[in-house]
Regions:
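Solvent-exposed, non-transmembrane regions of membrane-associated and secreted proteins
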Residues: 2-168
């Protein structure tokens, strides 16, 4: 019985250690991408805005390609000293690197960014307060400024509420 308890404690410590390491890794990856994005010039950017309206696909945005992933801009939360690259489209493996555009665009005022709760990513969002500034700068250098109106915790399955909420 004691051996089983010790085994469970060791497993819990290993899991905690992995989670801490994974958060550190994600923060390092995001910073590496930011550095590479900063070195890109307008000539190195890819304009993917020519997707046919008839195709039913969402309009693609100008991007900066870095290590096989396309990035649409940088999200900054000054009060948390946080700057993160934002990938053009999302998947679970991509969320392990950086926040991702879930849907929409800043220009159309319907941008939804999905992110992981790593300490070096979105882990501190729950500490934001109404009035805190948030900025998104796209790869063309256009800065969209926002202000936190409310901090709301939603279930991970609340996709419809997230997509249809009146957030602006």
């Amino acid at each position: 019985m004691i051996g089983g308890g010790i085994l469970l404690m060791v497993a819990a410590l290993c899991l905690t250690g992995f989670n801490v390491w994974d958060g550190w890794r994600a923060g390092r990856e995001s910073q590496k991408v930011l550095e590479q994005m900063a070195g890109n010039t307008v000539e190195n950017r890819t304009d993917l805005s020519g997707v046919s309206e008839l195709s039913g696909e969402e309009k693609r945005l100008p991007v900066i390609p870095v290590d096989g992933n396309d990035y649409i801009g940088v999200l900054e939360i000054p009060d948390q000293n946080l700057a993160l690259p934002v990938m053009e489209d999302w998947s679970y493996p991509k969320l392990r690197i950086a926040p991702c555009r879930y849907k929409g665009s800043a220009e159309e005022k319907d941008l939804i960014i999905a992110g992981h709760n790593y300490d070096r990513h979105f882990g501190g969002l729950k500490q934001l307060s109404p009035g805190d500034p948030v900025e998104f700068t796209d790869v063309e250098g256009i800065c969209y400024r926002y202000e936190v109106a409310e901090v709301l915790t939603m279930e991970g399955t609340a996709v419809e509420e997230m997509e249809t909420g009146d957030w602006d």
